[in-house]
């Protein structure tokens, strides 16, 4: 099943803005759900991206590939930066199941780390996607936040 799912997994593309409720529930974009459901996944996997200040998301196939690619070097006492990164990804990842309406409950600590409040922006990046605070996303792209940009346009 893993190899078949990895072979047919389509890329996550597009940018979508969705509301987050007080319980941390957010609707995963229908196009992202379709990619995952085509590979027979009923969950997303998320982890904090501390370098960018967002949440990274993907299908379970990514964790399976990382796990299979991880050499058993700890027993040999060998530790490399790439191996440490793989272990960080594996240990930071959380699996979030879809509810019947396509929502997931994002843990409060992940939302806080990414500065996400009432609105989240999903950004497709091929094999992975990111979940951003809208203002932080605009800033990371070198743009003024939408509210500021529209205020500045009239001046």
From Swiss-Prot:
Any GO BP: negative regulation of DNA-templated transcription initiation
UniProt cross-references to InterPro entries, sorted A to Z: MraZ (IPR003444), MraZ_C (IPR035644), MraZ_dom (IPR020603), MraZ_N (IPR035642), MraZ_sf (IPR038619), SpoVT-AbrB_dom (IPR007159), SpoVT-AbrB_sf (IPR037914)
Entry keyword set: Cytoplasm, DNA-binding, Repeat, Transcription, Transcription regulation
GO molecular function: DNA-binding transcription factor activity; transcription cis-regulatory region binding
Secreted in keyword set: no
Compartment(s): Cytoplasm, Nucleoid
Cellular component GO terms held in the UniProt record: cytoplasm; nucleoid
SpoVT-AbrB domain location: 15-62, 93-136
Classification via SUPFAM superfamilies: AbrB/MazE/MraZ-like
Subunit structure: Forms oligomers.
UniProt family annotation: Belongs to the MraZ family.
Name of the protein in question: Transcriptional regulator MraZ
Lineage, opening ranks: Bacteria, Pseudomonadati, Pseudomonadota, Alphaproteobacteria, Rhodospirillales
Gene: mraZ
């Amino acid at each position: 099943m893993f190899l078949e799912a990895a072979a047919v997994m389509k890329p996550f593309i597009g940018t979508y803005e969705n509301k987050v409720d007080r319980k941390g529930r957010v609707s995963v974009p229908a196009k992202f759900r379709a990619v995952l459901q085509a590979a027979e996944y009923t969950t997303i996997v998320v982890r904090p991206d501390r370098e960018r200040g967002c949440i990274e998301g993907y299908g379970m196939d990514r964790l399976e590939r990382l796990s299979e690619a991880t050499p058993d070097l700890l027993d040999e006492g060998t530790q490399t930066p790439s191996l440490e990164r793989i272990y960080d990804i594996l240990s930071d990842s959380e699996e979030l199941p879809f509810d019947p309406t396509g929502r997931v409950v994002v843990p409060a600590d992940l939302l806080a780390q990414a500065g996400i409040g009432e609105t989240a922006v999903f950004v497709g990046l091929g094999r992975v996607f990111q979940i951003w605070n809208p203002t932080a996303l605009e800033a990371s792209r070198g743009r003024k936040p939408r509210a500021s940009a529209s205020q500045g346009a009239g001046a």
